[in-house]
């Protein structure tokens, strides 16, 4: 069985730890903070088998160099660091071109890891899918999606469609605890969504207890996330009201997605 554990970092980051059965060697996803990772490894008597990086932002990559140095000093081995080839991330020594390398077979993990190209938040953003668990970095959040720092709306829209097409039971391990803020916007865009209202109540209760709202599931996100709900009439109506100065009488789904993301940016 693959066990997935969250390490809290910074204000709202999650660094994910992947451990197969009782193996002592584990993988971490997007270790922005070296100290919390080392504290976790030492507290649980674990060793680091490798690092999986989704994109180049510092809060996801800041711990790479120190973790590589730590493994070299303590074991004499070179730590495997996987990441997107197109983003030229310092410390990544196994660069992945997702159009070429779509499956990784990693030591200490029983199941293959699928690599998905999901540009939008950054130009070369990738995601990892293993044992029904999706590590999607800053592409898909519960109730929302990442800002478009480098990619285009068309790229992000395509990436989200790709993720939305995964099986409903796929667990979504995003990299930030943004859920409540996202749901506040989601309810403004989709005010009559009863499932969204119920999920907001559930998420609010979890956060009040200091618990994570992550993982979500693809099935849940399809029902509550406005960025996965396409041309849902209530969302279209909300966008038209927000952008009432524009003629939206005959536009496509991408235009609505673009406007929805612009609205979220200023919400």
Swiss-Prot record:
Q: Where do the coiled-coil regions begin and end?
A: none
Q: In which pathway does it act?
A: Secondary metabolite metabolism; methylglyoxal degradation; (R)-lactate from methylglyoxal: step 2/2
Enumerate the InterPro entries for this protein.
Clx_II_MBL (IPR035680), Glyoxalase_II_hydrolase (IPR050110), HAGH_C (IPR032282), Hydroxyacylglutathione_Hdrlase (IPR017782), Metallo-B-lactamas (IPR001279), RibonucZ/Hydroxyglut_hydro (IPR036866)
What SMART domains does the record point to?
A: Lactamase_B
Q: Which reaction does it catalyse?
A: an S-(2-hydroxyacyl)glutathione + H2O = a 2-hydroxy carboxylate + glutathione + H(+)
One GO term of the biological process aspect: methylglyoxal catabolic process to D-lactate via S-lactoyl-glutathione
GO molecular function terms here? hydroxyacylglutathione hydrolase activity; metal ion binding
Is Metal-binding one of the keywords UniProt gives this record? yes
Cofactor notes: Binds 2 Zn(2+) ions per subunit.
What keywords is this UniProt entry annotated with?
Answer: Hydrolase, Metal-binding, Zinc
Known NCBIfam families for this protein? GSH_gloB (TIGR03413)
User: What is the gene called?
Assistant: gloB
Q: Which residues bind Zn(2+) 2?
A: 59-60, 138, 176
Q: How does it assemble?
A: Monomer.
Question: What does the record give as the organism's lineage?
Answer: Bacteria, Pseudomonadati, Pseudomonadota, Gammaproteobacteria, Alteromonadales
What's the protein called, per UniProt? Answer: Hydroxyacylglutathione hydrolase
One Pfam family it belongs to:
Lactamase_B
């Amino acid at each position: 069985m693959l066990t997935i554990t969250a390490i809290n970092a910074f204000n709202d980051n999650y660094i994910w730890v992947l451990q197969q059965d009782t193996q002592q060697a584990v993988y971490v996803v997007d270790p922005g903070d070296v100290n919390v990772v080392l504290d976790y490894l030492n507290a649980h008597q674990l060793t680091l088998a490798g690092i999986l990086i989704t994109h180049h932002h510092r809060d996801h990559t800041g711990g790479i160099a120190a973790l590589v140095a730590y493994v070299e000093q303590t074991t004499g081995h070179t730590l495997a660091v996987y990441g997107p080839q197109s983003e030229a991330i310092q410390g990544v020594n196994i660069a992945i071109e997702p159009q070429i390398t779509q499956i990784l077979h990693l030591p200490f993990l029983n199941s293959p890891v699928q690599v998905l190209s999901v540009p939008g938040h950054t130009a070369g953003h990738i995601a990892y899918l293993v044992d029904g668990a999706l590590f999607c970095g800053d592409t898909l959040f519960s109730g929302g999606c990442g800002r478009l720092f480098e990619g285009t709306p068309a790229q992000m829209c395509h990436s989200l469609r790709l993720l939305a097409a995964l099986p409903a039971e796929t667990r979504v391990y995003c990299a930030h605890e943004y859920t409540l803020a996202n749901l506040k916007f989601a309810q403004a865009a989709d005010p009559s969504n009863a499932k969204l209202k119920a999920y907001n109540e559930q998420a609010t209760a979890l956060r009040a207890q200091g618990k994570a709202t992550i993982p979500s599931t693809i099935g849940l996100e399809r029902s509550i996330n406005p960025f996965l709900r396409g041309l849902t009439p209530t969302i279209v109506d909300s966008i038209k009201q927000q952008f009432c100065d524009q003629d939206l009488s005959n536009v496509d789904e991408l235009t609505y997605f673009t406007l929805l993301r612009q609205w979220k940016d200023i919400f």
